[in-house]
Design a protein with these regions (language model features):
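Canonical Radical SAM [4Fe-4S] cluster-binding loop centered on the CxxxCxxC motif
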Residues: 69-109
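Conserved, mostly hydrophobic/aromatic
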Residues: 61, 89, 180, 212, ...
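Auxiliary Fe-S-binding modules of radical SAM enzymes
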Residues: 1-50, 118, 247-372
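Short, charged low-complexity linear segments at domain edges
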Residues: 53-74
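Active-site-proximal loop/turn and secondary-structure-junction residues that shape catalytic pockets
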Residues: 79-81, 131-133, 159-163, 184-186, ...
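Core AdoMet radical
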Residues: 96-112, 117-212, 218-222, 226, ...
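Generic structural signal for well-ordered alpha-helices
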Residues: 77, 114, 141-145, 167, ...
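Catalytic cores of alpha/beta
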Residues: 164-172, 229-243, 302-312
Length: 372
């Protein structure tokens, strides 16, 4: 079986840029009319000229989403385990070179955080950590999952890339989904954003979803950090990656997230500004291209945008998020990974969803379905 690296190496960044610029309105219209969409159709949907068809794309995305997922929005909350990190990433508040107080939750603190989330009726929790293998490695994660398993129906993780064996252990412990972001697929500049630490290894990170799929994880989540490089080109490669994974690890489900670069301690300014209309175009493009793909919108986005996107392709949202370890109860002043934009409570988010004519879903999965 070809690895994604084999496929990735067949493409050049500048060639994809040129192809995007050459797309015509007729190309977009033909792609919209096709029954079975390909990665080439996705490229047409995210092209600059496709913005002229945004209204048509939005209506199509709305119809396809309701047909596949109904009028529901799944809700989750992140639980940050640690802000310790061995990497230097020029855009992240947890970066090793930021001289800030580091914190890793103890078992007692972890359960205090969990209790607050349970009081908000949260049943899907996303465990997040900086990348520090000695402090927060596989044994720490396994312990956290075991402690939380009886309290939450759905546990996802977003941590450093691990080995296939380690992902198998997490799956057996009760992890339902793993999220991993390449940040950017622009290999030539990747090192500039990640000058030190294991994250500087572009290929190892690129091959992580293969290891997740081989381990039998139920759901794999991908995304890029929008704002580092040209969002259209990065998104093409991200979709290419999802396309490859679905063909080779077809038993797994897939989701895509859209983190836009947000203010953080020691942050850099975005190299490429992504306007709301651009993000809307991208979300619609993903939905029209792939009807089964889960689309997740975090509290990085503002209230107005999140209210609007509910009916146009989103299937999953975070709510009441704290992006620092202990942020819900233990240590509310510890360093955040990034600033949130939508600071509404869980109840406020649920009420907003209901007013939009949709149903907020707090539980959509249980580990019993995996035989765990």
């Amino acid at each position: 079986m070809k690895s994604f690296k084999d496929i990735f190496d067949q493409y050049q960044w500048d060639d994809v840029k040129e192809r995007l610029e050459k797309v015509t309105l007729n190309d977009v219209e033909k792609s919209l009319q096709k029954k079975n969409k390909t990665i080439e159709d996705f490229l047409n949907f995210i092209s600059p000229v496709a913005s002229q068809k945004l209204e048509t794309m939005a209506k199509m995305a709305q119809s396809l989403t309701q047909k596949r997922f109904g009028k529901t929005i799944q809700l989750y909350a992140p639980l940050y385990l640690s802000n310790e990190c061995q990497n230097i990433c020029t855009y992240c508040g947890f970066s090793l070179d930021n001289l800030i107080r580091r914190k890793t939750l103890s078992d007692t603190e972890l359960m205090m955080e969990a209790a607050v989330l349970k009081s908000m009726s949260v049943n899907h929790v996303l465990l997040v950590s900086g990348e520090a293998n000695k402090t927060v490695g596989i044994e720490y994660f396994l312990n956290a999952v075991r402690l939380l398993k009886s309290h939450f129906a759905n546990i996802s993780i977003e941590v450093q890339p691990l080995s296939e064996e380690e992902y198998r252990k997490l799956h057996e412990a009760g992890v339902n989904a793993v999220l991993v972001y390449q940040e950017t697929y622009h290999q030539e500049v990747y090192k500039q954003y990640h000058p030190k630490g294991k994250k500087s290894n572009f290929d190892f990170r690129l091959e992580t979803p293969d290891r997740i799929g081989s381990a039998g994880i139920h759901k794999i989540g991908l995304g890029v950090l929008l704002g580092l490089e040209d969002w259209r080109i990065d998104s093409f490669f991200n979709a290419l990656h999802i396309d490859y994974l679905q063909k080779n690890y077809w038993k797994s489900k897939y989701s895509v997230s859209f983190p836009r670069l947000r203010p953080a301690e020691g942050f850099i300014e975005p190299n490429f500004i992504m306007e709301d209309k651009d993000l809307l175009q991208l979300i619609c493009a993903y939905r029209i291209w792939n009807e089964d793909l889960e689309i997740s919108i975090s509290t990085r986005e503002n209230e107005k945008f999140r209210n609007h996107i509910i009916s146009l392709g989103a299937t999953t949202m975070s709510a009441a998020s704290k992006t620092n370890p202990g942020g819900y109860s233990v240590d509310k002043e510890s360093l955040e990974q990034f600033e949130t934009s939508d600071e509404r409570s869980m109840d406020e988010i649920k009420n907003m969803i209901k007013k939009s004519g949709y149903d907020p879903v707090m539980k959509d999965w249980d580990s019993v379905y995996s035989g765990i």
